[in-house]
A protein has these predicted regions:
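A short beta-strand micro-motif common to beta-rich folds, especially ectodomain repeats
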Residues: 450-462
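Accessory "access/gating" subregions that flank catalytic or transport cores
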Residues: 26, 143-152, 163-171, 180-185, ...
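Surface-exposed or secretory-pathway low-complexity segments enriched in glycine-proline
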Residues: 418-440, 467-469
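Active-site-surrounding "flap" and adjacent substrate/cofactor-binding loops of secreted or lumenal enzymes
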Residues: 50-83, 89-93, 108-125
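Aromatic, loop-rich ligand-recognition surfaces of beta-strand-rich domains
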Residues: 521-590, 607-657
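Extracellular/luminal low-complexity segments enriched in Ser/Thr/Pro
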Residues: 441-449
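Catalytic phosphate/nucleotide-handling subdomain of diverse soluble enzymes
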Residues: 44, 48, 55, 59-68, ...
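C-terminal edge beta-strand
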Residues: 463-474
Length: 657
């Protein structure tokens, strides 16, 4: 956990920002027009690009199809008599409401509450995985951590975080810091860099109208050796080498970031891949809104996201007044962009809105951000501090409990990218023998099994917080000494899996059930699917162990794996042991830490969860868990006939005295 939660941009934000000169000035009218351009531009791009989402992968769309037009979405615009919500704009609307409710710098805990209340369906990939972890009790950035969110490398944060930057006009360092902070709700490592770069460009675009210069300014805020930064520089070089051949440039970038991508992160939704398609669209669009929009669709992959992001960015650069009226008012009789209507079709408790009202509210928040960070308003002028920096709110971030076992080296960080720079201390309780605590990190090798209550404090921003934690050190894992594995499915049916709509790199999947007691809980080859046939029939899976000699058991550690859209989780769980006559008996009541999911709804299921299941001690030659697999519908023509399997990485067995 320690490695995944390290902020890759921290050093850059502290040391590398180039001098930006004196305070920036912009009129209130121009500021509001550019904020309007961000909202309206994103709506144009999202609705325009949606029909082409995931359509062009191996090859881009032909330029002969330009301009694409709204195609089938023109009818939807007419039906709703305005713009309609989608994930490229609706999460930002939620963030607008959260800033109004909690202030311009909400905490991760505030963000979690907002997500859980408003987002109940229509999320995918990293966003869905983050939501599931929130319902398990975690807060960001653990919800985006590499070890817990198997979609950490996908595009999700780029398309939902632009608002942090267009409420920070001309404050690029602040915008980058806040965008990076928010990106970690769903993502980690190099996958947050596109969000940070676009955050820098959105903020800089209030005062920069040259596309190439804008990209180069944004690059100042990424580490020199960052993977995405290298890709952006390659795009700039390709544009110089092939100024009239965007297809060639797209081919080269797609080969490196898709065809030849690491199999574990090779998807059409990869963050760097899609973020670079947006950069190419901007370069070859040369600042022309319509051409940039068409190119962002033609580049392919998850193209509606690029279309929304770059269209909003050009909207900031040139202002809403410069956006083509045939795109903002495509329905006869409309006299305002999208008829001044934003209709919610995606989120719970998110009211329909006047677009102008959304713009006004965002403008007010932008002024609040400016004034809170060394800027001010004088008459009709907004005076901005371009060197403002974002300091994350002080808070404990909540993730899984430390995974501690006698004799197994531990390295767990309670600290994360948002609070690792603050002062940590152990203020109460005694650590397990063999462990030490320093600056938020627990290290060492536990020597004695048991339960240990400790209190940690966190100091910064002029205040101190304290929080209690319960550490459980498990004894040696009896599963490692099992003589047999009990299960109803021993081998993954790879042919069935390959025919389904899967969203992970193929190295993730183990071929046999033998991995459940190999000690590996994450990463390539760690996840076993009990997928035996192309079936959607209800079934109960079981996993367990047998020993030649009886063992005492009172705890099972169930480690689930990554989940597909069409299955992998369970609706109920039971635990059984072998009695002296060789019959399976229920262990009786058991407790689970954390609690098992309270619903089997697909959107609320956590990936890579660890459940400690405790029950009265039994002495037995066999133990197993029975899992009632979930039947989940899916839209894909083959996948819709496949479900009812369990995703598992490890099953531990213990006797904790």
């Amino acid at each position: 956990m320690k490695k995944a939660l390290t902020g890759c941009l921290a050093a850059v934000l502290l040391a590398s920002a180039s001098p930006m000169g004196a305070a920036e000035k912009i009129s209130k009218e121009e500021l509001k027009d550019k904020i309007a351009g961000a909202w309206i531009g994103q709506m144009v791009g999202n609705i325009y690009g949606l029909p082409f989402e995931n359509k062009f992968v191996d090859e881009p769309a032909s330029e002969s199809r330009f301009p694409f037009g709204y195609t089938k979405n023109l009818d939807k615009l007419a039906k709703f008599d305005g713009a309609f919500s989608d994930d490229d704009t609706d999460v930002e609307y939620i963030y607008l409401m959260l800033m109004e409710k909690y202030g311009i710098e909400p905490t991760y805990a505030n963000m979690r509450d907002g997500w859980m209340h408003h987002i109940r369906d229509r999320v995918w990939l990293a966003n869905r995985a983050a939501l599931g972890l929130m319902h398990l009790g975690y807060t960001p950035p653990f919800t985006g951590a590499q070890e817990l969110n198997p979609h950490w490398y996908q595009i999700d944060p780029q398309l939902i975080n632009e608002i942090w930057a267009y409420t920070a006009p001309g404050m690029p360092e602040y915008a980058v810091g806040k965008s990076d902070w928010a990106a970690r709700i769903t993502s980690d490592s190099w996958a947050v860099a596109p969000t940070a770069l676009y955050g820098a460009m959105y903020s800089e675009a209030f005062f920069e109208k040259d596309v190439r210069k804008l990209i180069e300014k944004g690059l100042r805020y990424l580490p020199e050796d960052d993977r995405y930064a290298k890709g952006v520089r390659k795009c700039l070089d390709l544009y110089k080498q092939y100024p009239d051949d965007w297809v060639k440039s797209r081919q080269i970038i797609a080969k490196e970031f898709y065809t030849d991508e690491d199999p574990m992160t090779k998807t059409i939704w990869n963050a760097d891949l899609n973020g670079l398609m947006g950069i190419l669209s901007m370069l070859y669009g040369k600042g022309d809104f319509q051409r940039t929009l068409d190119l962002s669709c033609a580049m392919g992959f998850d193209c509606d996201n690029q279309a929304a992001t770059v269209s909003g960015l050009l909207g900031v650069m040139y202002g809403a007044k410069a956006l083509p009226k045939d795109l903002t008012m495509p329905i006869e009789g409309w006299t305002l962009p999208f008829n001044d209507r934003y209709i919610n079709v995606t989120r719970f408790d998110m009211p329909d809105a006047s677009i102008q009202d959304m713009i006004n509210r965002t403008y007010d928040l932008a002024l609040d951000v400016v004034k809170a960070n060394g800027g001010k308003v004088q008459g009709n002028k907004v005076i901005i501090n371009p060197k403002a920096k974002f300091n994350p709110p002080l808070e404990f971030c909540i993730g899984p409990n430390p995974d501690l076992t006698v004799g197994v080296p531990a390295d767990y960080s309670f600290a994360c990218a948002a609070n690792k720079s603050y002062k940590w201390a152990l203020t109460a309780g005694t650590l397990p023998a063999g462990l030490s605590f320093d600056n938020g990190t627990l290290t060492g090798t536990p020597e004695k099994a048991g339960r240990y209550d400790i209190t940690l404090s966190l100091t910064g921003n002029g205040k101190t917080l304290a929080k209690d934690f319960n550490l459980v050190v498990k004894p040696q894992n009896l599963a490692m000494k099992a003589d047999t594995i009990y299960t109803n499915v021993r081998v993954l049916n790879e042919a069935v899996l390959d025919s389904c709509w899967i969203t992970f790199g193929k190295p993730m999947y183990a071929k046999t059930v033998d991995v459940i007691n190999d000690g590996v809980k994450k990463g390539a080859g760690s996840v076993f699917y009990s997928l035996a046939s192309a079936s959607k029939n209800p079934k109960i899976d079981y996993f367990g162990y047998g020993w030649e000699k009886p063992v005492a058991v009172n705890m099972i550690e169930l480690n689930t794996g990554c989940l597909e859209e069409f299955g992998g989780w369970f609706t109920s769980l039971n635990i059984q042991y072998l009695d002296e006559e060789g019959r399976w008996r229920d262990v009786g009541k058991y407790t689970s830490t954390p609690a098992l999911p309270s619903t089997d709804i697909v959107f609320f299921q956590p990936h890579f969860a660890q459940f400690l299941l405790e029950f009265p001690e039994v002495t037995t030659r066999g133990i197993r868990v029975l899992l009632d697999t979930k039947t989940q519908d899916h839209w894909h023509k083959y996948t819709k006939n496949v479900s009812n399997f369990t995703s598992i990485t490890e099953l531990g067995v213990y006797d904790l005295k």
